[in-house]
């Protein structure tokens, strides 16, 4: 271990209780996507007090921020991705209190080194990773070109085991609405246009579609509004749907098929329909083995047992970042192997001593990774060259 690494690790150890407190404060005050006013303000205050320049209200996300610390000397730009939104009804059952705090701690811990040796640190506060209306802020940031001056992006995610970056699926989230004509269901049903019939036809059509799509494709949804009274022909219904696929290219095809099912269902019932995307489209993750190798080496230095897994069925807007710069999204263990995300048990683990340990471990790993990338321009160049190759490939999963 180099003297520079030891200095950074000493900083993290000395200040860890302060950052554990921040994580607990965010955990105890969960906020939904694009409503994370407390969490974002707390992280911004911490970064500002450490001498970072703060930009707020990023790319249409009021609770987004970019915190920058720039050396007078040339060097690479290292991005740390901070998440801090919670889940409806469950709170921090995905551990974003750990993610956001670990990224901030990693960023501030290398500030003195960057100031002396060159480079730029950027901590991106990224709201609404869990989605929802105007969700997946990282996709907005990518569209706005906000990562164009970055060399790599680093983050860690709590999990039931410690993993390298796993595959993720591209996802679209949209609402389907049907518009009919109200009528009394007994006296003059013949004058009505039943929007619920259209919705039921739509769901039946999706069930039939599933036998003609790839095994890796996913279509799932719920009815949000099915009408108000059983003796009135519903003139309006609404459902929310997710479509997922192994790549953006495949997902565009799948979502197009779902829209044609909606069109057919409307035609069958004599209704009109609308399909509205309510959040940013999320892309699959482009995994960079060289960057993950670097993560694994540094994780093992800190006594983490790292597993490899090629079966991932979730989605994250960090995938969008991976389409523009080399990015990692590894997991750090916070509880037993039986732990499952988006559960009360995971929420409890995210606020436990195990979660605190993962926060500090994640910050140490990301910080020492960043030092190696700054110190070794040839290694960074190889990682970026591999990303260019991977980005140019067309994935065709059968």
Predicted regions and their residues:
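Active-site-proximal beta-alpha loop/turn segments in soluble metabolic enzymes
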Residues: 28-29, 122, 129-131, 180-188, ...
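Metal-dependent amide/peptide-bond hydrolase catalytic core
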Residues: 200-398
């Amino acid at each position: 271990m180099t003297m520079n690494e030891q200095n950074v690790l000493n900083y993290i150890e000395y200040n860890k209780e302060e950052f554990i407190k921040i994580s607990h404060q965010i955990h105890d005050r969960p906020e939904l996507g694009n409503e994370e006013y407390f969490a974002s303000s707390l992280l911004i205050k911490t970064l500002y007090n450490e001498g970072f320049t703060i930009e707020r209200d990023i790319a249409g996300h009021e609770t987004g921020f970019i915190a920058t610390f720039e050396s007078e000397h040339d060097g690479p730009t290292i991005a740390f991705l901070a998440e801090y939104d919670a889940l409806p009804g469950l709170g921090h059952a995905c551990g974003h209190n750990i993610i956001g705090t670990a990224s901030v701690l990693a960023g501030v811990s290398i500030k003195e080194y960057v100031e002396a040796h060159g480079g730029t640190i950027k901590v991106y506060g990224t709201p609404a990773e869990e989605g929802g209306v105007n969700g997946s802020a990282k996709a907005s940031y990518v569209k706005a070109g906000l990562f164009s001056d970055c060399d790599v992006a680093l983050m860690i995610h709590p999990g039931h085991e410690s993993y390298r970056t796993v595959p993720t699926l591209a996802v679209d989230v949209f609402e389907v609405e049907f518009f009919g004509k109200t009528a009394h269901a007994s006296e003059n049903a013949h004058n009505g246009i039943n929007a619920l019939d259209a919705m039921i036809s739509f769901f039946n059509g999706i069930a039939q579609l599933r036998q003609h799509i790839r095994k890796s494709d996913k279509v799932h949804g719920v009815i949000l509004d099915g009408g108000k009274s059983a003796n009135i022909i519903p003139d309006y219904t609404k459902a929310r749907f997710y479509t997922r696929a192994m790549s953006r290219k495949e997902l565009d095809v799948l979502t197009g098929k779902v829209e044609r099912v909606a069109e057919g269902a409307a035609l069958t019932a004599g209704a009109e329909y609308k399909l509205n995307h309510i959040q940013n489209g999320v892309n699959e993750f482009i995994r960079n083995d060289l960057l993950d190798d670097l993560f694994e080496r540094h994780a093992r230095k800190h006594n983490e047992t790292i597993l490899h897994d090629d079966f991932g069925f979730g989605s994250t807007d960090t995938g969008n970042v991976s389409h523009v710069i080399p990015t990692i999204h590894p997991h750090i263990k916070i509880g037993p192997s039986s732990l499952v995300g988006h559960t009360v048990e995971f929420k409890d683990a995210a606020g436990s001593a195990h979660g605190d340990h993962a926060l500090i471990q994640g910050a140490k790993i990301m910080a020492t990774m960043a030092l190696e990338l700054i110190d070794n321009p040839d290694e960074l160049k190889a990682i970026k060259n591999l990303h260019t190759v991977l980005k140019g490939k067309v994935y065709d999963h059968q």
